[in-house]
């Protein structure tokens, strides 16, 4: 009987095993985002015939109770995706490709925005139209993503910290080189990575709040060399020609870009070289102080309307990735600018007494700027080893010539040269991470200031002045850190040492400093908590000062899945003034301003707290962010300001002071890609109070400002409406009296009508500015443009500044000042431009 029972049990087990082995299981997912596809139809084909079919569950899984035979095939269909066949194997993960198709005259498409853990994936083909010329035109339409006027890219109002194309960083933080020149028709998708950790050796070990963006190109554009030529003719006084040429090749292993540009239309060619993040994680380098107030282009709005320029720029960037994933990159650039501008200013200060102190200025400037830079980087990013070796150098010369009403002329020349070499290495050894960083840099500058008067011989003698300061700055910094993991807890201990030697005015200023920074943090799926106290010891040898500066922070983050999270942090930091404040005892920085340095090293303490809440629903294309932060600043020194006969005199005094600041902001972005609509709304408010010193008197001030910024982009294939508004209100109080509230706003509207291959565009900007003690100023600037799009050519004719506006005027507040400025604009111009895409 016992043998019969055992035999029966074995028989049941064998049948169960056979039943289990006959079930064929698998998963159906989106090939772009990896998201599971529910209710997809899965058919099992044998010898070309369907023998069984099922539908996937909510997680994209399926199971077919059929014994597998050699040669069996899956056939999967799902609305919005291409039909897919593949052999039955051990994995059975079936990836479907999105496809638009016609079904009873209804166009069906896959979702344009998806989410995979901390990665938001935008299908750029769903946002691109034939009107779009470059990548920047496409990015501005993405919900949750904003592109600033200078080219900075933000996600939910926060600047991204890494921008790559095909996983490689060719631009090294210079976004405009790529976003202005990658063609819109060549892009496939954009991936926004929250908590971006680009260092493989630190992934799942060191958590970050950085945001990265990666652009993927279409297969037809990857590794292809393309050239873009953009010549133009500008009917001006005098009429002239200009333009640029770009050669680019983007791949996963090799990337290059070469640009040549010449412009007199008001464009800022230097924005191609604007750095929006530090591409290398190195020990810090030093910065050469500036002793004279070199003039610069003043621009309260689009600088292209104000810049009278003759500019040229050249650059080359080359990056390769070898079989071991090591990268080698080389970059070189040169730019030259000659810029002219005419401005007027009236400044009123509350410096005690019964009346305001007022100064005026009428100036015409000519800026001559030359800049050259070269950079080489060897980069390793392996699973257990990360490292960079960088050598770079740059040289520049800025000449600012300013003529003031009354015959006074000022010239400030600031040539400088900077050389640096840096290395960093990170190794993972089990639960330990060892990292060291070293840098050595040298800086040379020879600033010269000349002031002359043409009014008469007596005043020329009185006003003529010349000063020259030769600077040599040597700096080196080294740091070592050790990170060890204890389950979900991490301990990180860092040590840094720096030496800085500044020789100026025939005196050596040496700074020795060491920093100890232990950190403890906890990380799991729901919580992140960190605590990092630290201590810095500084020794200023020439000033004879030794200071012990504590710092530290506490950070708490709570994560609610992939939809929302909040974080709270509080930071305390003590710091000292830089060389610019203490190394030269007395100097004249421009024609009417003198600064007296302190005979001590000023010290400041800052307490900052921040609360932030994020919420997103990518499937509904909704993104939001709320922030509120407050800070208090304590200083051991104050700047005493005295104005006499229009001359500014600043003297550092030993006096304890404090200032407070509170800021709150809300950002919301919602997209409806089915109707090609994106909306944004940003709200912010700021309150600050502090103290200003004048002739020994203390003046308490307060400042209040709030801003409302709506945005709407509606861009179907037949037209585009682009609206941006910025409504700001601010007021200040010095002593007992509040100023009147200034309501300043800017409204931008662009309307494009598309008729086949022709785009008719009309754009306008309305500036409303309330002027102190005078009627409000309203300035309307408008441009009209016609673009004819052919297969590889774009031909456009634009009439700029339609109403031929001559000037623009505005008033702004500070804590104790009211400033009214007037700017002269570029005249009406006709531009003819052709773009060849080869």
Name the predicted role of every residue range.
Residues 49-61:
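Short, acidic Ser/Thr/Gly-rich low-complexity loop/linker segments typical of extracellular
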Residues 705-729, 735-838:
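Conserved C-terminal beta-signal and adjacent last beta-strands/turns
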Residues 44-49, 73-87:
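A short, solvent-exposed loop/turn motif at the edges and junctions
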Residues 20-21, 31, 59-61, 82-92, ...:
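Membrane-proximal, glycine/serine-rich, low-complexity loop/turn segments characteristic
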Residues 203-205, 269-275, 340-357, 391, ...:
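Outer-membrane beta-barrel translocator domains and adjoining extracellular loop/strand segments
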Residues 311, 319-337, 365-543, 550-552, ...:
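Face-selective signature of the C-terminal outer-membrane beta-barrel domain
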């Amino acid at each position: 009987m016992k043998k019969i029972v055992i035999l029966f049990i074995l028989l049941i087990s064998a049948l169960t095993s056979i039943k289990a082995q006959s079930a064929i299981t698998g998963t159906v997912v989106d090939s772009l985002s990896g998201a599971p596809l529910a209710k997809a139809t899965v058919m099992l084909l044998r010898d070309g015939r369907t023998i069984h079919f099922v539908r996937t569950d909510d997680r994209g899984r399926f199971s077919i109770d059929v014994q597998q035979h050699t040669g069996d095939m899956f056939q999967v269909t799902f609305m919005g995706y291409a039909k897919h066949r593949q052999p039955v194997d051990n994995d059975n993960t079936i990836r479907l490709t999105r496809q638009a198709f016609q079904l009873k005259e209804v166009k069906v498409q896959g979702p344009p925005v998806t989410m995979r853990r901390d990665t938001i994936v935008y299908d750029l083909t769903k946002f691109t139209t034939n009107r779009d010329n470059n990548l920047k035109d496409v990015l501005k339409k993405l919900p949750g993503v904003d592109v600033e006027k200078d080219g900075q890219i933000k996600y939910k109002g926060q600047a991204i910290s890494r921008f790559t194309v095909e996983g490689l960083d060719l631009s090294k933080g210079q976004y405009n080189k790529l976003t202005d020149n990658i063609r819109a028709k060549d892009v496939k998708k954009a991936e926004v990575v929250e908590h971006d950790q680009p260092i493989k050796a630190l992934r799942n070990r060191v958590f970050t709040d950085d945001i990265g963006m990666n652009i993927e190109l279409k297969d037809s554009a990857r590794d292809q060399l393309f050239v873009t030529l953009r010549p133009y003719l500008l009917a001006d006084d005098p009429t002239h020609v200009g333009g640029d040429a770009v050669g680019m090749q983007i791949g996963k292993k090799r990337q290059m870009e070469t640009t040549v540009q010449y412009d007199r239309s008001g464009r800022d060619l230097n924005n191609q070289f604007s750095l929006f993040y530090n591409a290398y994680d190195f020990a810090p380098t030093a910065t050469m102080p500036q002793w004279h107030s070199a003039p610069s282009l003043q621009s309260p709005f689009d600088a292209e309307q104000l810049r009278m320029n003759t500019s040229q720029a050249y650059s080359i960037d080359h990056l390769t990735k070898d079989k071991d994933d090591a990268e080698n990159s080389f970059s070189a650039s040169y730019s030259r600018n000659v810029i002219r501008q005419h401005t007027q200013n009236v400044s009123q200060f509350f410096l005690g007494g019964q009346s305001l102190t007022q100064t005026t200025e009428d100036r015409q400037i000519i800026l001559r700027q030359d800049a050259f830079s070269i950079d080489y980087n060897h980069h390793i990013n392996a699973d257990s080893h990360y490292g960079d070796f960088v050598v770079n150098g740059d040289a520049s010369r800025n000449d600012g010539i300013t003529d003031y009403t009354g015959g006074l002329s000022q010239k400030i020349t600031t040539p400088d040269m900077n050389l640096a070499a840096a290395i960093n290495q990170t190794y993972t050894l089990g639960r330990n991470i060892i990292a060291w960083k070293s840098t050595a840099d040298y800086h040379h500058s020879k600033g010269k200031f000349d002031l002359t008067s043409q009014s008469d011989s007596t005043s020329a003698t009185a006003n003529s002045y010349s000063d020259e300061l030769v600077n040599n700055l040597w700096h080196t910094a080294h740091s070592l850190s050790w990170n060890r993991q204890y389950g979900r807890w991490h301990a990180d201990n860092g040590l840094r040492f720096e030496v800085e030697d500044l020789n100026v005015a025939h005196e050596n200023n040496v700074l020795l400093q060491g920093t100890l920074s232990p950190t403890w943090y906890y990380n799991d799926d729901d919580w992140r908590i960190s605590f990092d106290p630290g201590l810095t010891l500084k020794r200023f040898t020439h000033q004879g000062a030794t200071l012990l500066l504590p710092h530290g922070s506490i950070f708490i983050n709570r994560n609610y899945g992939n939809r929302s999270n909040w974080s709270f942090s509080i930071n305390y930091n003590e710091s000292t003034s830089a060389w610019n404040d203490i190394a030269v005892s007395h100097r004249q920085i421009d024609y009417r301003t003198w600064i007296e340095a302190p005979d001590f090293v000023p010290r400041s303490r800052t307490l900052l707290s921040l609360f932030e809440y994020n919420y997103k629903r990518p499937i509904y294309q909704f993104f939001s962010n709320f922030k509120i932060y407050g800070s208090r600043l304590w200083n051991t020194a104050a700047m005493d300001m005295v104005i006499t006969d229009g001359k500014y005199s600043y003297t550092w005094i030993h006096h304890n002071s404090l200032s407070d600041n509170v800021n709150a902001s809300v950002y919301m972005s919602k997209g409806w890609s089915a109707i090609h609509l994106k909306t944004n709304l940003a709200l912010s408010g700021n309150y600050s109070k502090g103290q200003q010193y004048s002739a020994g008197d203390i003046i308490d001030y307060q400042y209040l400002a709030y801003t409302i910024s709506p945005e709407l982009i509606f861009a179907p294939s037949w037209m585009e409406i682009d609206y941006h508004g910025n409504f700001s209100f601010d007021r200040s109080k010095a002593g007992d009296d509040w100023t009147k509230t200034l309501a300043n706003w800017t409204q931008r509207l662009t309307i494009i009508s598309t008729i086949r291959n022709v785009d008719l565009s009309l754009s306008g900007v309305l500036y409303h500015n309330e002027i102190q003690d005078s009627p409000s100023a309203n300035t309307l600037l408008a441009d009209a443009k016609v673009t004819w799009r052919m297969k590889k050519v774009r031909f456009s004719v634009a009439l700029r500044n339609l109403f031929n506006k001559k000037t623009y005027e505005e008033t702004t507040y500070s804590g104790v000042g009211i400033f009214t400025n007037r700017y002269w604009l570029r005249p009406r111009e006709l531009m003819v431009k052709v773009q060849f895409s080869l």
